[in-house]
Amino acid sequence: QKRDEGKIKFYGMATWECFRVGIENPQYLSLENIVEMAKKIGGNDHGFKFIQLPFNMNYDQALLAKNQSVQNKPVSILESAVTLDIGVFTSVPFMQGRLLSPGVMPEFNELKPSLRALQFIRSSPGVLAPLVGQKLPEHVSENLEIMNIPPINNDDFLALVKKLTS
C-alpha cells in the first residue's frame, strides 16, 4: 500500500541467521522463495530489492556456504542475490572490534586491520556496502580512508579467497 502511495520505493529485510544457516535449520530462508513471494504479492515491480546480513572474515558463510538455490543450482547467498538482482548490505565488519586485534585477521595486503576488513567485504561480489557502527570521529575518519583505495578486482579477489581458505 505504501509503495502504491509512493511513500516507499524499495524495501528489504535484515537477518542475523536466516541466510547463513543450512537448509535443515528451522531459521533458514531461501532468497529465491522470498523473491517469488514478493512477485506474487506485488507483481514484477514488487520493490523487494535489499537484504542485510552479517559478513566478515569470521562470519564468511555469505561468501562460502552454498546454502541457497537458484534455478536448482546450489549457490551462496551473495551469488543468489546477484542472480536475483537483490542488493546486499553487510553488518558487523569488525565483529564489534574483535577482528581488529593484531594477528586475528589474515594478512593479505599492507592495509591496517580496519581497512583490510572493509576492503575484503566491499570487494566481495554482490555486496553494495558494509554497514559500520562507529562511536568516535577518528574511527569515522579512519574508515573513510577506504574510499581512496580501489576495490580488489574480481579475479584477484577470488584468488585471495582461495589462498585464505586453503
Give short role names for the model-derived ranges.
Residues Q1-S166:
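Beta/alpha (TIM)-barrel catalytic core signal, keyed to glycine-rich beta->alpha loops juxtaposed to Asp/Glu
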